[in-house]
Every structure is written in structure tokens, then in C-alpha cells.
Amino acid sequence: MISIVLNGEPKEIVEGKSIMDLVDTLNLPAERLAVEHNLKIIKRAHWNSQALEDGDKVEIVQFVGGGSAGNC
């Protein structure tokens, strides 16, 4: 197991996992996410190849539609 910081919270994950593995484990919709890994935005095309290591910091932001056009 390794320790990462996910959205500001410590999290233990299995060693050798990628960003895509993490997204899958969290059951998040990949098409609506932005991922920052150690202060760098990672393109979705690289999620499978970007391995997570002990001490990494990951921020995952999920885009949600909605709002009111009348208040613009």
C-alpha cells in the first residue's frame, strides 16, 4: 500500500495503480472529470500510463451541469 493525498484527504491505495485505476475505484464518470497530479493537469489520454506513487497529491474535479440562465 502507498499513501496519497486525494482532494486534500489522505488515502491508502494499492501500489502500482494508475490515475485511471483510481478513477475506476472511485466509480467516477471519467468523461466529466479533470485530474491534477502533483500540480499538473493530466490529459485523459495519459490517465492509464500515469502511475501513482507514495506521497503523490491528486485533485479530482467533477463537472456538473445545471444552474439558471435567468440569473445571468
Over which residues does each language-model region extend?
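Compact, glycine-rich, soluble single-domain proteins
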Residues: 5, 14-47
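Loop/turn positions that initiate beta-strands
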Residues: 55-58
